[in-house]
């Protein structure tokens, strides 16, 4: 059976319902932008004073640092990084003997020597001088990589273009 429903909203409206609301919040005039005609959503979204803006953007008098990608300092950092890596490898080689001695002296490790779970736990097998040999292999690989990078850098230079004195010589060179 169809039921007809109606909303009785007439009694909820007052005479001043389309007038200003009773609850009004005072909005700061500094948060209003006459350019866009909008209010600022957050009081912290943009600086209010020019001094704050300058501090936020950094110096604009040409002393701003260039991007890391385009600066020559990036090339130096890769060289320093590879040197640092090589230094760490040499430290590992020197300390590998001490580490192997400590591992041999630990009685709990000696009891579990040859156990696969121990090797999984430590991440290395207990083969004598394995740390030293791994560090040596890594060092050799790093020197190969550095040599390859230097070789690629030398070969990546653009060869000087041949200069053709006139259009006839140029076309002749293209056809040959």
From Swiss-Prot:
Residue ranges the record marks as coiled coil: 82-112
Keyword terms: Activator, Apoptosis, Cell cycle, Cell division, Centromere, Chromosome, Coiled coil, Isopeptide bond, Kinetochore, Mitosis, Nucleus, Phosphoprotein, Repressor, Transcription, Transcription regulation, Ubl conjugation
Disordered: annotated span: 34-80
Chain segments carrying region DD1: 20-50
Residues bearing the modification Phosphoserine: 17, 28, 71
Motif (Nuclear localization signal): 63-66
Compartments where found: Nucleus; Chromosome, Centromere; Chromosome, Centromere, Kinetochore
Motif (LXXLL motif): 118-122
InterPro entries according to UniProt: CENP-R
GO terms, biological process: apoptotic process; cell division; CENP-A containing chromatin assembly; negative regulation of epithelial cell apoptotic process; positive regulation of epithelial cell proliferation; regulation of DNA-templated transcription
Segments of skewed composition (Basic and acidic residues): 49-58
Motif stretch (LXXIL motif): 171-175
Bias (Polar residues) ranges: 34-48, 60-80
Recorded GO CC terms: inner kinetochore; kinetochore; nucleoplasm
Source superkingdom: Eukaryota
Assembly and binders: Homodimer; mediated by the coiled coil domain. Interacts with CCNA2 and MTA1. Interacts with NFKB1 NF-kappa-B subunit. Component of the CENPA-CAD complex, composed of CENPI, CENPK, CENPL, CENPO, CENPP, CENPQ, CENPR and CENPS. The CENPA-CAD complex interacts with the CENPA-NAC complex, at least composed of CENPA, CENPC, CENPH, CENPM, CENPN, CENPT and CENPU. Interacts with TASOR.
Domain notes: The DD1 domain (also called RepD1 domain) mediates the corepressor function and is essential in the triggering of apoptosis. Contains one Leu-Xaa-Xaa-Leu-Leu (LXXLL) motif, a motif known to be important for the association with nuclear receptors.
PANTHER family membership: CENTROMERE PROTEIN R
Role according to the record: Transcription coregulator that can have both coactivator and corepressor functions. Involved in the coactivation of nuclear receptors for retinoid X (RXRs) and thyroid hormone (TRs) in a ligand-dependent fashion. In contrast, it does not coactivate nuclear receptors for retinoic acid, vitamin D, progesterone receptor, nor glucocorticoid. Acts as a coactivator for estrogen receptor alpha. Acts as a transcriptional corepressor via its interaction with the NFKB1 NF-kappa-B subunit, possibly by interfering with the transactivation domain of NFKB1.
Protein's name in the database: Centromere protein R
């Amino acid at each position: 059976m169809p039921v007809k429903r109606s909303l009785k909203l007439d009694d909820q409206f007052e005479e001043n319902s389309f007038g200003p609301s009773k609850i009004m919040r005072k909005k700061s005039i500094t948060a209003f932008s006459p350019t866009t005609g909008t209010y600022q959503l957050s009081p912290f979204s943009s600086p209010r004073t020019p001094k704050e803006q300058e501090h936020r953007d950094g110096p604009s008098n040409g002393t701003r640092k260039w991007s890391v990608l385009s600066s020559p300092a990036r090339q130096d950092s890769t060289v320093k990084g590879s040197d640092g890596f090589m230094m760490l490898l040499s430290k590992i080689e020197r300390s590998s003997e001490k580490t192997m001695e400590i591992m041999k002296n630990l009685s709990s490790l000696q009891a579990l020597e040859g156990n696969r779970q121990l090797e999984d736990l430590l991440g290395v097998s207990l083969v004598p001088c394995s740390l030293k040999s791994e560090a040596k292999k890594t060092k050799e690989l790093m020197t190969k990589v550095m040599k390859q990078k230097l070789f690629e850098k030398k070969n990546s230079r653009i060869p000087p273009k041949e200069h053709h004195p006139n259009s006839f010589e140029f076309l002749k060179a293209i056809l040959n």
